[in-house]
Amino acid sequence: MAATDTISLDTSEALAGLRARLTSARNADGGWAYYAGKASRLEPTCWALLAMGDASSDVLRQWPATDGLLLERRDGASNFGFHGLALLTLLDRKIEHQAGNGALVAGIQRVEGRASPRNQFSVQNNQLQAWSWMDETSSWVEPTTYCALALKKAARAGMPVDRERVLEADALLVDRCSVDGGWNYGNSNVVGKNLPSYVPTTALGLLSLQDRSSEDAVRRSLTWLEQEALSERSSIALSLALVALRVFGRPVQAIASALVQQIPTTLVLGNLHAAALALYALRTDHADAALVL
């Protein structure tokens, strides 16, 4: 964070409240649910481990997997997007999954979103295949961002990665970038109508494409996010915007202040995923290492 981006003094109180909530809501198995008292789920568990670097990570080391793919919850199905997030967490925390991180990297490279034939109602290239949320479904923006970023990080850690999978994922994100910049959840245009971009998906898209900063889609999306970051006031949207813009070296003071103001509401609502994301975003001592290439 730039020297001019000093976060307000009440941030320390917000950080303490978020950490206390996550600590008290942790399940006996070491994971976190979306809401206290519920079963542990992969997404909030990953963000909580990223946010609290000193928390025991045994739960993720032992997280159930089938055929190299992590399950979204115990006795559940694989979720490719959260598998990518888990890989980012494993690499950042220097955890070796019981199945081997190499097996998890290989597992996510075996699956891909379903291709669709070109048609007159879509301007995007539906032949591009990246990642879906679940098997036998079409590619979506969020799982593609998590998986592509995880593979880029894995490659930089010396793990075997199919570069063509990463390049096709990048191409899909560029292809689906909205006209004015940013990303919708799936498509940029349907039956001739441009779809709106959203802050969380745009932040994730930028993080995934941070090594492609010369792309016009990235420049347009960065401009869009700077303009629209405060338009979605949820802790999840503000947190992701804060992290993405910070990674790109842009000013984040206004977003950080808005996020701090949102923390009391986040704590009242009790969403542990949002609390973990906010704690990660407001901390600066980790230098966003989990998400930076």
Spell out what each predicted region is.
Residues Q262:
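Basic- and aromatic-enriched surface patches that contact anionic nucleotides/nucleic acids
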Residues A258-L259:
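Protein-protein interaction modules outside structured cores
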Residues S56-L70:
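A short glycine/small-residue-enriched secondary-structure motif
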Residues M1-A16, W32-S56, L71-Q109, G113-A171, ...:
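An alpha-helical repeat/solenoid feature that recognizes helix-turn-helix modules
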Residues R26-A28:
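N-terminal capping segment at the start of a domain
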